[in-house]
Design a protein with these regions (language model features):
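Amphipathic protein-protein interaction modules
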Residues: 67-125
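Amphipathic alpha-helical interaction segments
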Residues: 22-26, 36, 61, 87, ...
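N-terminal low-complexity, intrinsically disordered segments
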Residues: 1-71
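Generic structural signal for hydrophobic core residues of well-folded globular domains
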Residues: 54-57, 83, 87-88, 128-132
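Short glycine-rich, low-complexity/disordered patches
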Residues: 40, 64, 91-94, 156
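A recognition module on extended beta-rich or small alphabeta surfaces enriched in W/G with H and D/E
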Residues: 101-156
Length: 156
């Protein structure tokens, strides 16, 4: 009964997390209903499918932060992150150099070499449960896409 986001404490732990990305995503998808699994195709639109499932399953952020839900939270965060990364061309990273950093110990992804653009999928999943719009993940994706395209166009 944790009620807190689980943070990573080492780069080795992060590298292990990355190395198991495909297996963890496969295990997460296998736990979902078949009709939903078929709709999670890695597209930006599938973020809405995932968000609808999250909203139906979890009435509050605290509900997904329970220890027994850790694999669902991790799986959902991985799925969201991989959709962003694959569609927008980003890279995963972990920052452990500043404990006051907002995403300290939380895997994040970034997209631009010359302008830092961090997004962390785990807080995106929990914020979608707080906002409860059913459109939050896709809205953030589209905003990130616009920002990235604009910045890439300005880079030499």
């Amino acid at each position: 009964m944790s009620k807190r986001l689980r943070k990573m404490i080492s780069h080795e732990q992060f590298q292990d997390w990355l190395a198991h990305m495909d297996d963890a995503l496969e295990a997460f998808l296998a736990r979902l209903p078949a009709e939903m699994r078929e709709r999670l195709d890695g597209s930006p639109e599938s973020l809405g499918v995932l968000e609808a499932w999250l909203l139906e399953r979890y009435p509050t952020i605290d509900a997904i932060l329970e220890d027994e839900e850790a694999s669902h939270l991790d799986g959902a965060a991985r799925y969201v992150g991989e959709v962003f990364r694959r569609m927008l061309g980003g890279h995963w990273r972990l920052r452990l150099n500043n404990p006051k950093y907002v995403y300290y110990g939380i895997p994040e992804f970034w997209f631009l070499e010359k302008k830092d653009t961090p997004i962390a999928s785990l807080p995106l999943v929990t914020s979608s449960l707080d906002r409860r719009t059913g459109k939050h993940l896709l809205l953030v994706f589209n905003g990130a896409k616009e920002c990235i395209e604009r910045n890439r166009a300005q880079q030499p």
